[in-house]
Amino acid sequence: VQGVPRHNSTSGEGLALVVPGIGNSGPGHWQTLWEQRHPGWQRVQQRDWDRPVCAEWLHGLDAAMARLSAPPVLIAHSMGCLLVAHWAQWASRPVRAALLVAVPNPDGPMFPPAAQGFQPVPAEPLRFPSLVVASSDDPFGSVAYARRCAADWGSDFVEAGTIGHINADSGLGDWPAGLVLLERLLKL
């Protein structure tokens, strides 16, 4: 059934690692609000959130992974999704699952020119269960692009409606529908 994650994962509460995109998901972003509701969750830290360099961001993600006591669920937004795809090809640390929200197209006109090294986007399957979530009016990446990434990565796919870039500007608050998708990803 389209929209329903089909991967199985281990039961029980696990760690989560928030992987923001450019700008580090500010105070009104659902990633930040989720993290505030779950004090045990952690966030990747990057040296420069406004001028991302993929090679540097890879090391930031890997350093955060090294500090965790168990395989986490990765909760990525925008450029964080591209980072997860690159990291999955570069590193071998275990991951429970990944929620990949609003995948941007690096060849699109809205992709930040300050971002370096995110192209080409890996087209190999991820080695962990994953779900790509897209919006039908995301200015940074079309549904068709997100669907292609999901197919390349072996990810399940959900089109979440007309909710922009699925960020604070979308007015989602703590995005309850996203939490439902995360819970379904982890339970199936």
Please provide the spans of the model-predicted regions.
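Catalytic histidine neighborhood in serine/cysteine hydrolases
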Residues: 40-42, 151-167
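Short beta-strand/loop motif that positions the catalytic acidic residue
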Residues: 126, 131-134, 138
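Conserved hydrolase catalytic core segment
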Residues: 86-97
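Active-site nucleophile loop of the alpha/beta-hydrolase fold
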Residues: 21, 46-49, 99-108, 135
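Acidic catalytic loop of the alpha/beta-hydrolase fold
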Residues: 24-25, 136-141
